Every structure is written in C-alpha cells, then in structure tokens.
Amino acid sequence: MSQNPLPPSRSYDLALRNFRLQAGLTPQELDELETTTLEDLQKALATMQTKQQHTKKLMYLKRLQPFLDAMEQYSTVINIFVNTSNLLAFVWGPVKFLLVTTSNVSEVFNALLDGYRSIGEQMPLLLQYRDFFDSNQYMQKALASIFEDVLEFHLQAVQLFKQRSWKQLFHATKQSLIRKVNDVADSLKRHRAFMQSQASLIQYQEFDETRTYMKEKFAKLQHQERDIRYRRVQEWL
C-alpha cells in the first residue's frame, strides 16, 4: 500500500522546488523560464520554422501540437484548483529551452519532437472531465501527478542539454531519454484510464501504487546505466 499522497497544492510546490534545485540552470535562465508564456513558445517555434525554411531543413513541428493542445486544456482546468500563476511556465519554458538549444542538430531536435508527440498522444484531454474535478479529490490528485510526470521528463532533458558536451553525451544517454519518454507516456495513459473511470478511493490507491512502482523501477534502471557508462569511461582511460 502506498503512503497517503500529498495534498495537490503541496505536490506542485515540491515538484517545482525539485526542478529549480536539480535542473542546473543559472538564476538568469530560471528567471527566463519562469516567465515564459505559451505565446513566447509559439513565437520561438515560428522563428525556428522560418529559419528551417531558409536552410531547407523543415522538421515538421506539428509533432508538438498534441502535447501543446493537451497542456492548454490542462492549464484551463488547473487554474480552478491551484493558485500558481506561473505553473505552466514550467511546461512552456522547458519546451522552449530544449527546442531552441537543439534546433541546429537535426537528429536530437527530431528525437525531442517525437518524444513530445508520444507524450501528447497519451495525455488525457481534461476539459471533458472538468465537472468531476471539483467534487473528486482523487481526480485533483491525479492532475498533480500529470504535472509531476511532465516535469520529471523536462528535468532529465534539461539536465542533459544544459551540459556543454551534450552533443557528445546525447548518443550515450539517448536510450535513457527514450525510456523516460515511454515511462511518462505509459503513466499518462494510466491517468487517462483512471479519469475515464471517475476515480474511487480504491482505484486511486491502486493507480498511485502502480505509478510509484514504475518510477522506482525507472530510477533503478537509470542508476544501472550510469554505473555502466562510468565503468566504460574508466576502461577507456
């Protein structure tokens, strides 16, 4: 049996605090991220698209659209329950940072777009459930879990692409990033099924236990991969 989950507002606060502490961003970068709006992201995407047209390297940015659509609906619903004006900046900001950073490396840029498409296609479209959130605390807690899942993906990706040597590291860490995408997509698929059932206490406990187990399993795999990479470096030296 999993422990009692935190109240939704507390879950958001802890997720944001963890991201700020572990992302490896400078204070200036964090300030920019925390003030990023969807409009800012869309302007950056338009600039990237224009540049790609000029260089004849158009890379189908519409792959990002399912994710953006789902997160827009998320924003509409979550504003009813959480008094955090900059919450979605921690979605739009990392997307902008990651795509701007990798826009000149086609393989990496495409991998990120594919990842966002996979995540976006599994996200529940929340407006159809909005009448249930107000009266169902377990649905509200599931909303917080969705944000945590997306932010965990962004944390791992930002940690990688913030490093100066990310172009060299990408191939060594690509499979780990793909696994994280799949992990988040699977979790969001469970969120969607959970919301369709309109969430009883027993269902929430089962859902939360499964989510905790999968997160622990993924963390163990990450640790094993780091050990393997470290040993390979030592052998090379």
Name the predicted role of every residue range.
Residues 76-82, 102-105, 130-141, 199:
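Acidic, serine/threonine- and proline-rich low-complexity regulatory regions
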